[in-house]
Amino acid sequence: MATNSEFLIPARADLAAAREEWLKSLKTMRRLSDNTLIAYERDTRQFLQFLTGHLGEPPSLKEIGNLRIADLRSFLANRRNDGAGARTLGRGLAGVRSLLRHLEKRGLVNAAGASAMRAPRQPKSLPKPLTADDARRVVSADGQMAEEPWIAARNAAVLTLLYGCGLRISEALGLSGDALSDPSARSMTITGKGSKTRLVPLLPAVHKAVAQYRALCPFDLSAGQPLFRGAKGGPLHAAIIQREMQKLRAGLGLPDSATPHALRHSFATHLLGRGGDLRTIQELLGHASLSTTQVYTGVDTQRLLEVYDKTHPRA
C-alpha cells in the first residue's frame, strides 16, 4: 500500500521508503536536534525536486546510484541561483550526503563518488555580540515593550537566560515549569544539541528575572508544563521572542545584529573578555568542539584593536 511520503515527495516508491527510513534513523539513532531534522528533510526534498526536473521524471534508487558529482554541482548551482548562501548550500549538501551514505550502508546504491563531494567553502564571519551596557538594557524588565506586565516579565526572563546563562533560545523555551523554582540553586542541568547535557551556573539576576515572571504569570507552571507560555497559555515560540527583540532594537537604537542569539554570543564574549578560559566557555555553551568556541577569540581581539585605535596616543 502506498504511503503518504510517496505522494508528498517527488520520488519513486523505493526511494521514498528508503528516505523515510533514513529520517527515522536520524531521530532514533543519531538523536539529532529537531531543527536539524527539519532542515535535512527540507533539503533532501529540494534535492529530489531538483532531480525530478533534471532527469525529467521522479528519481528511484537506480537514478540515485547513477549520480555523478556533476549532478550535485548542478543542484548547488540551482540553489545558488535561487539566492542560497554558502552556509545554506553547505547544510543542504550535508543532508544529501547523509542520505547517500545511509543508502550505501544499506546496500541499496553505490554513490561513493557523489557522497564524497565537499561542501562549498564558507566565509568565516565573527559573531556580533552586544556591548555589556546594551545587553543589560535588553534584558532589563523595565525596558520591555510588552504592555501586559506578565508578558514583559516573561520576555525579560527569557532574554536574561540567554545572556546570563548562554542558553540557546530553544533550550530556554524548552525548560519545564519547575525549572529554577529553588532560589538557592547555584546551577541547573541543560539538555542541548544531540541530547548532550551540561551544567550551567545560575546568577542571582537570573533567579530574580524568573521569579518575577512566575509571580505574574496567570498559568500553571508546575512540573511537566512548559515554563514559558504564550499569551493564550500554550508553549512560547521562538518567533515571539524574535519579534520582541525587533521591537527592542527599534526602541533602544540597536543594530540589526542584536538578535536573541547575539545575547548568547555576548555571554561568551564578555566572559572571555573578563578572563574566562576557552575550555570553560566551551562547556558552558555546550559546544562539541573547541574550534567552535575559538571564534570568540577573534571577536575579543577585534575589540581590543578597536579600543587601541581609539585610545592609544600613538594610534
From Swiss-Prot:
This entry carries the following GO cellular component terms, namely: cytoplasm
Source organism superkingdom: Bacteria
Q: Which residues form a coiled coil?
A: none
Q: Does the keyword Transmembrane apply?
A: no
Q: Name one GO molecular function term.
A: tyrosine-based site-specific recombinase activity
Disulfides per UniProt: none
Residue ranges of every copy of the Core-binding (CB) domain listed in the record: 13-104
The UniProt entry annotates the active site at 168, 193, 261, 264, 287, 296 (o-(3'-phospho-dna)-tyrosine intermediate)
The Tyr recombinase domain covers 125-309
Query: Among its keywords, does the record have DNA-binding?
Result: yes
Provide the alphabetized UniProt keywords: Cell cycle, Cell division, Chromosome partition, Cytoplasm, DNA integration, DNA recombination, DNA-binding
Biological process (GO), any one? cell division
Main subcellular location of this protein, as a coarse class = cytoplasm
What this protein is reported to do is described as:
Site-specific tyrosine recombinase, which acts by catalyzing the cutting and rejoining of the recombining DNA molecules. The XerC-XerD complex is essential to convert dimers of the bacterial chromosome into monomers to permit their segregation at cell division. It also contributes to the segregational stability of plasmids.
Q: Which family does it belong to?
A: Belongs to the 'phage' integrase family. XerC subfamily.
Assembly behavior: Forms a cyclic heterotetrameric complex composed of two molecules of XerC and two molecules of XerD.
Protein known as:
Tyrosine recombinase XerC
